Amino acid sequence: MPHEGMDSVATAKHTLGGNRAFEVLWQAQQYWLAMDTFRRDRERNKNYTYGRQWDDYVCVNGRKIREEELIKKQGNVPLKNNLIRRMVQAVLGIYRSQAKEPTCTARDRDEQRYGETMSTVLQCNMQLNRMTEINARCMEEFLISGFVVQRKWYGWRENKLDCWTDYVQPNNFFIDNNMKDFRGWDCSCVGEVHDISFEELCGRFAKDGNDYNRLAEIYKFAKDKSYLSATFDNFGYPLQGYYDFLVPYDTSRCRVIEVWRKESKPRVRCHDVNNGDVFKIDIEDFQAIVTDENNKRLQEARELGMDESDVPLIRWEWFMDSYWYYYMLTPFGDILEEGETPYEHKSHPYVFKAYPFIDGEIHSFVSNVIDQQRYTNRLITMYDWIMRASAKGVLLFPEDCLPKGMSMDDVADEWARFNGIIMIRTPKAGTPLPQQIANNCTQIGISELLNMQLKFFEDISGVNGALQGKPGYSGMSASLYNQQAQNASTSLLDLLDTFSSFVKEGAYKDVKNIQQFYDTPRVFNIAGKNSTIVEYDPKKIRDVEFDLSIVESTATPAYRALTNDMLMQLWEKNAISVEQLLEHGDFPFADELLQSIKSQREQLEQGKVPDGISPELAQQVQQNANASAMQQAQQMLQAS
């Protein structure tokens, strides 16, 4: 028997009983609260990206006030020029123009045909989940917050049982704050806060009428903060005002807290020398799987007269296993569902990537240029204020020049009138004539400062004018312009490759889920092309190990044009037939023309008159008397 306390789940059940979920909730809440700074930074970055750039708070006379309100109180207009949005759009354009997709390669070269099959199946699953759009939006999230999360799961959606991918909003996600490995391999706890309708809740967790009544009773009080506070205080976990983790913003929704964390228990690691399998088993199964099997092999060896030292026995060793265990919890500490990870990849369903995560710190792409954006907005607002405050068209009118019968108001009205005439009294000697004063106070260096900030903006972000598609200066060569765009792309290479590694990690879990849950033969077809129809056989592919790589997509117009040109050259040199040209090429008329050619061939083989053949040749075909006529018709079909 294992020592008491080795099995963490069994120990919690024994010592805490029905209250053990509160310990899990408390730990999850601490991780969620530890990400409060990240959530605030993300909100600030998002505000600057989408134009809300005067929402920072400043302290004036001991009172916190938003910058926008302060500027308005001073009688100014809080102007802004959103450069960050343009920068983010440029990087998103670069990402979409790459048009990359994950492909599978079998580690065993003899199983490479299975790698091609899995690549097709993976592409079909990506089309099902609209991954092109999901990854683009995840890339935007990655630029804004520096942290992106997806959830890979298997189940029912829209009456379809399949492998699904969901975007996870980082504000609803929490993770072990002790993690320092930027690969995420030292993570010990992850989770997500779900706000779902009561109908979705029952569809997921209610198996019968009793479950429905239990859920209705639980969530009847989930909107009452005082009831929640009293519940947690009774069990020694005071909330101290932190209700956001337990109470949804929309009180019509039902909150479910999903927690995945590492648990431990003693297990036995086995190595079957007979077939090379390495596996682990529970202590309770050791007798049946290892001891009895080894005794059986020894008995058979004795019956055959073999030496016991030559018998391939199952080798084993005792060890403490650290495994992923999940909890589906209510805000009141009810466990809706729990268990060891059901996935054969033996991990949690989440895929996440933080950037750059050196020493556990997250610094997003947008955060690097917020100071330049703020200073640019400040210069623009200051420029506008100076222009409005400077003297423009002020009339200096000496009192000695004021004629009889006119007041200064009359002079002002006449001055502002189109084609107005102002009469003046002849001034005395030394008295100046009325004159207009215009003071140009704008040339104080603001334009130079603004241009310098715009240049800093491009230098810091690495997104220059060439990358944004701006025209070059007069006389710039095309090679220099292309080189500038290439240099800018190089500065973004680390960011793009980091996101590609995130896509690869997600594709790896997709492949593992497909191998596990696609347990019946299926036929897959991508975009209706006959050449990409594959049959998925789970018996052959289930145990194949695949390497994944991110390569250029074959669905881009440039790739299709290159393929068509190569096929046309091969066809002109009679290296391939017209049927092969139409099958492997990408022509808008390929399917119809190929079907027509096959139909004509069948008519020829049956001795019928195909369309498009001269009457003389048709008569010879019908008589089936001239073999050269058949050959001539075949040549006509190949030349068409």
Give residue spans per PLM region.
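Long, highly charged low-complexity segments enriched in Glu/Asp and Lys/Arg with interspersed Ser/Thr
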Residues: E579-P615
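Short acidic (Asp/Glu) and glycine-rich catalytic loops that position anionic groups and cofactors
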Residues: R96-E101, P349-G360, K428-A438, A478-N487, ...
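Charge-rich, acidic-biased intrinsically disordered regions
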Residues: R52-K64, G155, F397-A416, S474-L480, ...
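Terminal, low-complexity, charged helical segments
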Residues: H3, K13-L16, T105-Q112, S119, ...
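Extended, helix-rich architectural segments
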Residues: M1-Y325, L329-E337, A391, C401, ...
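Extended amphipathic alpha-helical segments with heptad-repeat/coiled-coil character used for oligomerization
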Residues: Y167, S479-E579
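Extended, charged amphipathic alpha-helical segments
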Residues: F279-S474
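Generic, well-ordered alpha-helical scaffold segments in large soluble proteins
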Residues: V121, N125-L128, V369-A389, E414, ...
